[in-house]
Every structure is written in structure tokens, then in C-alpha cells.
UniProtKB/Swiss-Prot annotation:
Organism of this sequence: Acorus calamus var. americanus
Cell compartment(s), UniProt: Plastid, Chloroplast thylakoid membrane
GO terms for cellular component: chloroplast thylakoid membrane; proton-transporting ATP synthase complex
Binding site for ATP: G170, D171, R172, Q173, T174, G175, K176, T177
Protein name: ATP synthase subunit alpha, chloroplastic
Catalytic activity line of the entry: ATP + H2O + 4 H(+)(in) = ADP + phosphate + 5 H(+)(out)
Enzyme Commission (EC) number: 7.1.2.2
């Protein structure tokens, strides 16, 4: 039988006492009172902060949004199906943040910046808060560089600048997403990082957009943040802020970024759902009172950084869906008042075959010609006014039987101008090609052609110019000005191509 040696036992006890470190850990905890519909009510959590992350016993994360006298309203970042009444919840002391890095380029992630494209984890050593304060007045400078969309109607008449917020608004199925995705495709080789945020869309639609980007090599400089229609309302509400945090990471590294929110109507609906379930008082159209702040704090993060901060930029292109063209509804008017202009897409124009279906009359860019190169200003200066006058005249001409020659000529010119603004989807044009197209139309070179021949002629003219007069493109690219030499080259090319085209049409 082994003997117990008292000195050994006392040595072991002494060692243990010497190694013992007293650690007091205070955890702010609470108990689940009620859970359901993506909302949990918690008793306790006395020192929780508004917007703080809380962790449930089974691992689900939530955000404390409602701090009431006897309970805390938490929105869940997941389905919460395994959370039970009476289970414990602890406050984490953190607010929502995501990892950020260059490795996110070319990836599809969710609102928590977790990859959902099946290509493994994304390496990141840095974190950014999902909700960051917008840059102040001193940190910004006015918008002066163009962000080319590749769409003639926009770049010539409703120009978008780097750091601007330009709303794309219209009914469903009018080509809003097409305008946004074409803008991303046109950034190839322009050193612009693009972020596409899909909120509450069908998974098939998001897959189609991603496939389009991959086929055209746009995923190299694009990040897609997607929360589809079956995602919890909390994640649909967070997705735009996640996209903004990713874009800001590049903006503060002196890079140019462009972010598309597709669409903010769905984010507002998700926020309305959360607010009503949290029993916040409803306002107009049952939206909560702070729905304006929901969008303003998001869109104010888009900026053109000052030269002290490296002149990076974040251009926001939010999309809002209207019902039967009603731009005076609550969410459309809110977002119109926050942004620096809007591109209005009309269902009537879309159905009439005018695509992109941009209503030039009520679309506007509050940055204006500051966001255009000099060459574009020179050729496109009057085109918006001419088109608006034509639309008015066309409406009047429906009731007039006999029109004078000048009016007939103006109508004929207007129809050809409208024709040259038509573009197929995913076929953006370079600036020099746009200058060629607009100059040809506004100077009457298309007046001798039938309307049906306009598109074909312009395609041939652009090809002819590229092949036979490459110096035209060089002048526009290097000087950004429509010089006399460039004009002479273009006039010569138009005359040569027009003669050739008419000859081919006769044979």
C-alpha cells in the first residue's frame, strides 16, 4: 500500500496556489422572453448599447435595435429556429463589422461578407465597421471627373461624375439593372473598382448578372454582395451598408470605386418589416419615421475625397422602383432629395422600343457638364434641349394637320437624334465613339437617311473611322478636346462613309 507523504502533498498545493491567477469576467447577459418572425425580445442585457451585437446560446448573432424600459428588441441575423424561450443571451461589446481586403475582388459575398460562391474563404486581416460616418465637408472636394457609363444618352445629357450620387428610377421591367450593369462593364480598363449590391432579388437574377460579368471579364474588378428574396429582413437591411464598407476600403486607399444598390425600395421594405415587428410607430405608407435617415446615412458615404486624402472616390448609383411611374411616392421622393440627380426610365418608351428607355425631359444631373470631358461638352451641349423641344413638338404635331417646312425638318431631326441614342444591352461605347455619334446627328448628316438606316450607318461609320483614321481616337484620348483637326478628320470620314453607304443601299 502506497504511503501518503505530507511534504509532497503540501508542495503540490503550494505550487497550485502560486500558479493561480484570479480572473473576474463580467458578462452582460439576458434571457429570451419571446422569439419569432426574425425578432427576439430579451429581458436583462441592462448595459447593452443601441446597435450592439448580441450572441444567443446556440450561436445566432443579433443586433439590439430597440432599448425599452423592461426589455430589449433584437433583430436576428439568421432564421433563429433553434433559439428557445428562456435561453441565455450575452452582449458582445462590439458593433457590426466586416473583414475587408483586395481578395474580395471577383467574389460573391453575403451581407456579413461571407463568401457564397463556393470558392473557399477570403483572406483578410483588416476590419471595417458596417456603419461608418460619412466624410465631412473638409474631407471632400467637388466632383470634376467623369464616370463614363458607355451609354450615349447618359454620358452626353445626364453625365455622372466620380463621387456623385445618381439615382436610377423607373417601373419594374424598364431596364434599370441593365443601365447599372452596363456601367460596370464599361469600367473595364478604367481602374475603377465596382461593387454590385443585390437586395431582395431572385437568386436566378443575381446568378444571371454574375454570369454576365464573368463572361465579359468584369468580375476581375467587381465585388457582388447578394441577399436574395428568401434572406432574413435583417440581412437585406444590412447588405447596402456592407457594400458601402467594402467600397470605402478602396476609396480610402486612393482608388476610384462605383457602387450600385439594386434596389433601395426592397431595403426600405425590409426595414419597414423589422420596425413593425419591433412595434415602432408606423408613419406614411407604414414606413417608420427614420426611413429617410436609413437612406441618407448610406448615400452620404459616397464622396470625392479631397487632395489631402488622395482624391479617391465612391460613386453611388442607387436604384428605386416606382409603381406606375409615380415618382411622388414616399421612398422615390426621399431618395430623389438625397441624390445629385436622377435617370428616369419610362415604361412607355421601353415598350415603344426606345432602349435604354431614358426620359431625357425629367432626368437630370445636378453636377452637369463638370462631369464631362471638353470634347463631349463641345458636341453635346444643345442635344438635351433639342430632344426636349422635339418631344414637345411631337406631342403637338399629333393634333396638327399641316406643318410648315421648318417644323417638319425639326421633327425629322428629332426622330434621328432619338434613334442614335438607342443602344443594345451590354454594348457600351467609348467616349470617342459617342462624340462621333452625337456630332453626326446634331449636324444634320443623318437627315438624308431613312430612320431605319441610322443605326446601321453609325456602326459602319465608327468601324470605318477606327480602321482608316485612328488619329481621331488618339486626339480625343490625349487632349480630351474636339479640336479643329479632329473635326476635319470626322467630317471627311462622314462624307466618305455616307457616299459609300448610299451607294451600297442602291445596289
Amino acid at each position: 500500500m502506497a504511503t501518503l507523504r505530507a511534504d509532497e502533498i503540501s508542495n503540490i498545493i503550494r505550487e497550485r496556489i502560486e500558479q493561480y491567477t484570479r480572473e473576474v469576467k463580467v458578462v452582460n447577459t439576458g434571457t429570451v422572453l419571446q422569439v419569432g418572425d426574425g425578432i427576439a425580445r430579451i429581458h436583462g442585457l441592462d448595459e447593452v448599447m443601441a446597435g450592439e451585437l448580441v450572441e444567443f446560446e446556440e450561436g445566432t448573432i443579433g443586433i439590439a435595435l430597440n432599448l425599452e424600459s423592461n426589455n430589449v428588441g433584437v433583430v436576428l441575423m439568421g432564421d433563429g429556429l433553434t433559439i428557445q424561450e428562456g435561453s441565455s443571451v450575452k452582449a458582445t461589446g462590439r458593433i457590426a463589422q466586416i473583414p475587408v481586403s483586395e481578395a474580395y475582388l471577383g467574389r460573391v459575398v453575403n451581407a456579413l461578407a461571407k463568401p457564397i460562391d463556393g470558392r473557399g474563404e477570403i483572406a483578410a486581416s483588416e476590419f471595417r465597421l458596417i456603419e461608418s460616418p460619412a466624410p465631412g465637408i473638409i474631407s471632400r472636394r467637388s466632383v470634376y471627373e467623369p464616370l463614363q457609363t458607355g451609354l450615349i444618352a447618359i454620358d452626353s445629357m445626364i453625365p455622372v461624375g466620380r463621387g456623385q450620387r445618381e439615382l436610377i428610377i423607373g417601373d419594374r421591367q424598364t431596364g434599370k439593372t441593365a443601365v447599372a450593369t452596363d456601367t460596370i462593364l464599361n469600367q473595364k480598363g478604367q481602374n475603377v473598382i465596382c461593387v454590385y449590391v443585390a437586395i431582395g432579388q431572385k437568386a436566378s437574377s443575381v446568378a444571371q448578372v454574375v454570369t454576365n460579368f464573368q463572361e465579359r471579364g468584369a468580375m476581375e474588378y467587381t465585388i457582388v454582395v447578394a441577399e436574395t428574396a428568401d434572406s432574413p429582413a435583417t440581412l437585406q437591411y444590412l447588405a447596402p451598408y456592407t457594400g458601402a464598407a467594402l467600397a470605402e476600403y478602396f476609396m480610402y486607399r486612393e482608388r476610384h470605386t462605383s457602387i450600385i444598390y439594386d434596389d433601395l425600395s426592397k431595403q426600405a421594405q425590409a426595414y419597414r418589416q423589422m420596425s413593425l415587428l419591433l412595434r415602432r410607430p408606423p408613419g406614411r405608407e407604414a414606413y417608420p419615421g427614420d426611413v429617410f435617415y436609413l437612406h441618407s446615412r448610406l448615400l452620404e458615404r459616397a464622396a470625392k475625397s479631397s487632395s489631402r486624402l488622395g482624391e479617391g472616390s465612391m460613386t453611388a448609383l442607387p436604384i428605386v422602383e416606382t409603381q406606375s411611374g409615380d415618382v411622388s411616392a414616399y421612398i422615390p421622393t426621399n431618395v430623389i432629395s438625397i441624390t445629385d440627380g436622377q435617370i428616369f426610365l419610362s415604361a412607355d418608351l421601353f415598350n415603344a422600343g426606345i432602349r435604354p428607355a431614358i426620359n431625357v425631359g425629367i432626368s437630370v444631373s445636378r453636377v452637369g457638364s463638370a462631369a464631362q470631358i471638353k470634347a463631349m461638352k463641345q458636341v453635346a451641349g444643345k442635344s438635351k434641349l433639342e430632344l426636349a423641344q422635339f418631344a414637345e413638338l411631337e406631342a403637338f404635331a399629333q393634333f396638327a394637320s399641316d406643318l410648315d417646312k421648318a417644323t417638319q425638318n425639326q421633327l425629322a431631326r428629332g426622330k434621328r437624334l432619338r434613334e442614335l441614342l438607342k443602344q443594345s444591352q451590354s454594348e457600351p461605347l467609348a467616349v470617342d465613339e459617342q462624340v462621333v455619334t452625337i456630332y453626326t446627328g446634331t449636324n444634320g448628316y443623318l437627315d438624308t437617311l431613312e430612320i431605319g438606316q441610322v443605326k446601321e450607318f453609325l456602326v459602319k461609320l465608327r468601324t470605318y473611322l477606327k480602321k482608316n483614321k485612328p488619329q481621331f481616337q488618339e486626339i480625343i484620348s490625349s487632349t480630351k478636346t474636339f479640336t479643329e483637326e479632329a473635326e476635319a478628320l470626322l467630317k471627311e470620314a462622314i462624307q466618305e462613309q455616307l457616299e459609300l453607304f448610299l451607294l451600297q443601299e442602291q445596289t
